Amino acid sequence: MEKILMLNDDQIWIFKKHTNNIQLLIEVALYLKSNKSSVSKKDKDAMYDIFSESELYNPRESLRDKPLDTINHKLDGLSYFMFGYSDRINDENKFIFSPLGNLFLKYLHDKDKLSKIFSCMLISMQFPHPYSKPSECFLLYPFRLIFKLLLDKRLQGRLYHYEVYKIIIHTISIDEAKYEFLVKSILNSRKKSWNEKLNELSEIQHKVVKSVYEWQYYIVPLLGSLHIFKINNGDIEQKLYHPQKDGSKSPPTARKANNGYVEINDNLTNFIDKLLNKYSFLDTPILLSDSQRKSNDVTKEIYSFYPELLLAEIGETISFESHILNIPKLITEYSKNPDNSTSGKFEKILEEAFNLFIDVEAQWLAGAGRTDIECMYLPINEKFSIEAKSTKNKLSMINSGRLKRHRTLISANYTIVITPRYVPSVRYDIEAQDIVLITADTLAEYLYNNIISNNRDISYADIQAIIVANLGKDISTQISNLTLSKFG
């Protein structure tokens, strides 16, 4: 195959293969929810004991596959399919559910809504994936590409399993030219007989059998059980064998490849088409190795996907939480406006955000020479100011003298600067000043977790305490830890 699609034979998409049963993932997620999402070794051992007694889960006895490894596989499955991610607080691992993960658990008794929610989870999945090291070689949205191909009329609305593990999973990145080449390659493969294609697989069985196993035994059944895929198992099979390990006395393990195919379920076709019109398969994924951002900030952004299109589709109220989650994206969008005409929108959404606190009154102040938002912390009648710093690039400096004048005008005690990212020297600009920094996605995450936990009485007290103890610093880490301690 041409290099336009391939790195080499060894660099292919790797799909998680630790479960093909959505109910098991649900049970693990519900267990985490009911146990404060702690995933320490002690908690994992307890999970192993509980799930070992479940009809859903019967782990094999193995010297290699210890209980800790087994549970890690299940947690990795949740993270892989975008239910959430792990973070640390006070040297303890916690699992943070994503907005879509929470929404999925909310509608467990509605199969139609679950199909649409999980479709969005797949749409949000990117390579490189934070929980799939082999995916770091790629730069695309794998399931957006799969869905795009399934909707391509030239391919008759279907993808044969053979086409996935022989052609598609070798795609490194995608653009229009590569996509057309991919379609052409698939159409050309359909000119071959099935005997010819299955014989090809036999000739390279040691290279392809793992992908056959991942796709046909795990991904396809999982998406079939969620009513995302319609599955045809074909009528021709070919046994493929895994390489035998050195010194093994057991016969090589066989897997069955067949001439089956998948289609998108009829009731999802229009919805997925709408999603792809909004979230293109050509979009560039977020880089995990962004040297300008902390890795946990990158992870937060990846898992913050929460499309209003989905909320409208399932009849979920398009509430303010969706705007909160979009703050980092809105910053980027507004800052690209050449005449900066959208900067006021960022300030307005922050005004709404701080008015979510029951003990804060926030008011946007228009005009030059003034702070962006004036706030009153009601329990002690103390004012503070907010400066909204939307910027296409990293915030390069803070004029602490100017912010002090802004505080003096309204008799504010301190200033909160909210920005997507900044250069390290900005920390020196606020050192020993009555100023703190918070990254936008950190604030969004804290407010969102309050909202989805049905905590409508959000108090500012904890944030106030953090600020008073950390003036002159970036308090994003402390706010993240607060989120984890309350909702992790």
UniProtKB/Swiss-Prot annotation:
It catalyses: Endonucleolytic cleavage of DNA to give specific double-stranded fragments with terminal 5'-phosphates. It is an enzyme of class 3 (hydrolase). Its EC number is 3.1.21.4. It comes from the Bacteria. GO terms for molecular function: type II site-specific deoxyribonuclease activity. Keywords: Endonuclease, Hydrolase, Nuclease, Restriction system. GO terms for biological process: DNA restriction-modification system. The keyword Cell membrane does not apply. This is Type II restriction enzyme HgaI. It comes from Avibacterium volantium (Pasteurella volantium).
